[in-house]
Amino acid sequence: MRADNLLFSPDGQSVALIDWQGCCIAPPVFDFAYFLIQSMTIEDRQRLEDNLLRFYAEELERGGLKISLPNLREVYESSLIYSFAIACSIPLINDPSIPRVRELAIAMGTRSIQVLKDHGQI
């Protein structure tokens, strides 16, 4: 999650999240995976990933969408490359000479490569 994508109400009591960067038709798990990979440190994601996947499955079921944890994991793992693709696009659609853009691209790329390694995809 990036602060650029948060809209706060004038009184500071509510917040909205927007992001039009990756508009596509895909399973909702793609958004969850992208959020998990790109909003946490590598160490935190590695430590919390299983618990957060379980929690996500429980919340989906609570909302009326029953999905088994093994099925959710399968879809989650199929979505990991999406995060890498978005990371690769950062220096292409932004000016990489800007330090903030460069730092973002490096962080996103590093996180994306590590999750692919962690799941045996590279």
Kindly label every feature range from the protein language model.
Residues I25-G64, L80-R100:
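Active-site activation/catalytic loop segments of kinase-like enzymes and analogous catalytic loops
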Residues M1-P28:
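Active-site acidic catalytic loop and adjacent metal/ATP-binding pocket
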Residues D11-G12, R62, K66:
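Short, glycine- and charge-enriched coil/turn segments that flank and shape catalytic ligand pockets
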Residues Q13, P70-I122:
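Regulatory N- and C-terminal appendages and interdomain linkers associated
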Residues L6, I67-L72:
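A short glycine-rich, hydrophobically flanked beta-strand micro-motif that places a catalytic Asp/Glu
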